[in-house]
């Protein structure tokens, strides 16, 4: 599947410190250090394309864009993979509601997502993979788990006639995965509280454990389906899709599994369990999660409809750089509520930064300093903030102080020093924050 066009990312004039982030599975701030000689594998769960990109989505993809940029700034080559869940229940239900074919709806929303990501200057994935593309790998993985005894069949009495002679859904047997719970560290009671609301089927008759995740759904009338060989006609479950896409395009364990914190359980927990069932290996070395963005007292959600859409803000004439700055003003691990005041503050900040960059570049004292190396103290401070658990608000404050020094009352050596930093600040703001100061 085609991705979008990546922004140009300038190289810093120094090698930044490697990023440290909060690892959900470890419950601690942990350095992201690729294994010697290996790329930094980054997998970020993508959209289910039944509606447009809202600011909760954008915040997540921006957080992992910071991870990507921080790893690159530290000298690590990055291989970034993202999936698209281009067949799933929410997509099918929305297509039926709207009277359009599910493939048409998915295609339209995927293109809108690409446009939003390009406008926000998110570095594009090296592999952008639809779930449908990965079905052959899903089938092979599910068959392997059945053969090893780590998956089992549950008869599907309501299956379509073409689902096979003995149609069945297939489930992972979590009792065969002793590491289950290694990502979330939740209790079974905590898991059960959200399992049904997050795509699980705890009341499915015939399951060995109510939390066992669906691997293969036998074909039902009116649902899209694919040939699964000995599995019969059907389609894969949600979690196995990411498991196989990540394994095929990154290998396991890769460095970082990322997503919103509503994916900690069941999605990332199940992806890890399925990988253990397949290979006995870890799925990822680190799990990093973005907190929810709310609106009107609830998390922003396509199912609830309380959305601020990136595409609508762009259509209204908002500068995507201001949208990006508004999201960067909040730390990724802090849940927060969007208001118009965030965007207004971001507009003002962007204008001030660009004015400072223009003023510093045009200043006679800057011209006098052209023979001297450009200063990089501010750029280094900015890089330090991003390396410290993606402290974007702290990074913005660093640039704010520089802009104040350029545009304020200071004269003499202090003002000249701030103006001499202009080139380094422009480069670092672009490379690390993804903001072009013009």
From Swiss-Prot:
Q: EC number(s) in its UniProt entry?
A: 6.3.1.13
Its cofactor is: Zn(2+)
> For Zn(2+), which residues are the binding ones?
45, 242, 267
Q: What is the superkingdom listed in this entry's lineage? A: Bacteria
Matches recorded under Gene3D superfamilies: Anticodon-binding domain of a subclass of class I aminoacyl-tRNA synthetases (1.20.120.640), HUPs (3.40.50.620)
Family of the protein in this entry: Belongs to the class-I aminoacyl-tRNA synthetase family. MshC subfamily.
Protein name, please?
L-cysteine:1D-myo-inositol 2-amino-2-deoxy-alpha-D-glucopyranoside ligase
Q: Organism source for this protein?
A: Kytococcus sedentarius (strain ATCC 14392 / DSM 20547 / JCM 11482 / CCUG 33030 / NBRC 15357 / NCTC 11040 / CCM 314 / 541) (Micrococcus sedentarius)
Q: Give the gene symbol.
A: mshC
């Amino acid at each position: 599947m085609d991705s979008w066009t990546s922004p140009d990312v300038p190289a810093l004039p120094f090698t930044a410190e490697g990023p440290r982030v909060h690892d959900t599975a470890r419950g601690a701030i942990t350095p992201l250090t690729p294994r010697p000689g290996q790329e930094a594998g980054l997998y970020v769960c993508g959209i289910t394309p039944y509606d447009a990109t809202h600011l909760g989505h954008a915040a997540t993809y921006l957080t992992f864009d910071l991870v990507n940029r921080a790893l690159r700034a530290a000298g690590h080559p990055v291989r970034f993979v993202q999936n698209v869940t281009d067949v799933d229940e929410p997509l099918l239900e929305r297509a039926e509601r709207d009277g359009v074919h599910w493939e048409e709806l998915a295609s339209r929303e995927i293109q809108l997502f690409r446009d939003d990501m390009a406008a926000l200057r998110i570095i594009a994935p090296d592999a952008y993979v639809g779930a449908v593309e990965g079905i052959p790998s899903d089938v092979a993985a599910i068959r392997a788990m059945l053969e090893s005894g780590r998956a089992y069949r549950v008869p599907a009495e309501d299956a379509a006639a073409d689902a096979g002679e003995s149609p069945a859904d297939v489930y992972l047997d979590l009792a065969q995965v002793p590491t289950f719970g290694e990502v979330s560290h939740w209790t079974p009671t905590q898991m059960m509280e959200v399992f049904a609301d997050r795509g699980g089927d705890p009341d499915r008759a015939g399951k060995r454990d109510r939390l066992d995740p669906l691997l293969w759904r036998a074909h039902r009338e009116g649902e899209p389906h694919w040939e699964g060989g000995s599995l019969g006609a059907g389609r894969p479950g949600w979690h196995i899709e990411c498991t196989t896409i990540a394994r095929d395009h990154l290998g396991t364990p890769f460095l970082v599994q990322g997503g919103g914190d509503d994916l900690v359980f069941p999605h990332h927990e199940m992806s890890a369990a399925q990988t253990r069932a397949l290979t006995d290996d870890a799925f990822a070395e680190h799990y990093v999660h973005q907190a929810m963005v709310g609106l009107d007292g609830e998390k922003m959600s396509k199912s609830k409809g309380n959305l601020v859409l990136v595409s609508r803000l762009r259509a209204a004439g908002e500068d995507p750089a201001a949208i990006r700055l508004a999201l960067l003003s909040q730390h990724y691990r802090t849940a927060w509520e969007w208001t118009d005041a965030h965007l207004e503050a971001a507009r003002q900040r962007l204008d001030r930064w660009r004015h400072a960059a223009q003023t510093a570049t045009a200043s006679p004292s800057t011209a006098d300093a052209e023979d001297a190396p450009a200063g990089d103290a501010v750029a280094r401070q900015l890089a330090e903030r991003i390396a410290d658990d993606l402290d974007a608000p702290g990074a913005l404050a660093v640039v704010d102080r520089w802009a104040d020094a350029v545009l304020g009352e200071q004269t003499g050596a202090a003002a000249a020093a701030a103006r001499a930093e202009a080139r380094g600040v422009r480069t670092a703001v672009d490379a690390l924050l993804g903001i072009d100061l013009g």
